[in-house]
Amino acid sequence: KTDGGSRINCVSTQDHKSVSELLELRKNQQMVFQDPTGALDPRFTVYEILAEPLENQGMKRPDIKKRVVELMKIVGLQPDHVNRFPNQFSGGQRQRIGIARALAVNPKLVVLDEPVSALDVSVQAGVINLLEELRASLGLSYLMVAHDLAVIRHASDRVAVLYPGRIVE
């Protein structure tokens, strides 16, 4: 059973004494949400969505532009589409934008909440394959929450099955 705490890179998420320590921990962990439509602000362009975490980290404008282009390429989207709004993309493309946003600050851990459940079956494999490629090329660790064990088996090295908060398998 979980005790309400967690450790990331041997650092407790509960023992932080300062805001700067908590911000540093958050920088090293990012989240990709289940519903790409709900996770992206429809008032922002893709550029603004991807630039926001970089601005929050104090990155300079020319470096932000380069990083946004790099992120678009990394997730398999056309860099010249950065001035579009989320509603101009398909569900799979929106999920790729969410993945790019999570990768913007070079996290060590990405938490994926049902990353493909809201996508068409034909698009799911492409996103799972992208996640696999990114994990290998960027040295990422994933914590994936999903109900589809086939997706979990394909995308994971280790699996824990939970039932009412307890690991049962």
Please place each PLM-identified region on the residue numbering.
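ABC ATPase NBD coupling module
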Residues: 7-30, 56
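Walker B motif beta-strand of ABC-family P-loop ATPases
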Residues: 109-111
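Q-loop/switch helix immediately C-terminal to the Walker
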Residues: 35, 44-55
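P-loop NTP-binding/switch modules centered on Walker-like glycine-rich loops
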Residues: 119, 123-169
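Conserved catalytic motifs of ABC-family nucleotide-binding domains
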Residues: 106
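Conserved ABC ATPase "signature" region
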Residues: 55, 62-80
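Conserved ABC ATPase signature
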Residues: 85-89, 93
